[in-house]
């Protein structure tokens, strides 16, 4: 049920984990490659990228390398290159409030409005690195529709060759929203899946699978 397992990586594919540190998802993606193909694990934070590198080395993911670049730089270097892309986006962390009250202070400084803008930039840049017919998985650990369904709606407007594809359901998964207050989102956002902490053990998450058109 992890985000990495939902991406269904196959041996021999080229895979990007765009916001990868500290490496839990990256190591799972790397293991799925079974030593074949390529994993690029990126994090914009230098200290976190070093931790990411250590974890990949500890897990013996030899067909990987770590980058420490903003997404737009990677997008310039790897246009239409990857079969699979993981975007576990930086977010306001509302789903972590119960686990870590200190996140509330960070949220007051940089809330959903700040991260929504950042996510909209990241997801389009990520889409530009996806091969035709490839798959991208977007996830956050926050409740805000601004950081979830609004981000997906923005992607679908900017890259109309992309579509949201259904994923296997689990009990207590909730559909994504198609509207919030006075704002409407793309109808396909109902294919997104929300995990609520009062319905399932753990933190709040949103999962979305985006597939590039074969075009």
For each of these PLM feature ranges, what is it?
Residues 34, 130-131:
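Helix-to-beta-strand junctions that scaffold the AdoMet/dcAdoMet cofactor pocket
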Residues 135-139:
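Conserved beta-strand signature within the Rossmann-like core of class I S-adenosyl-L-methionine
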Residues 207-214:
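Conserved small/polar residues in nucleotide/adenosyl-binding loops
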Residues 47, 84-124, 141-148:
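Mobile active-site "lid"/loop adjacent to the S-adenosyl-L-methionine
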Residues 149-169:
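Conserved Class I S-adenosyl-L-methionine
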Residues 19, 52, 85, 134, ...:
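Residue-level signal for inorganic ion chemistry
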Residues 30, 124-127:
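A structural alpha-helix within SAM-dependent methyltransferase catalytic domains
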Residues 1-81, 113-118, 165-199:
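Glycine-rich nucleotide cofactor-binding entry segment
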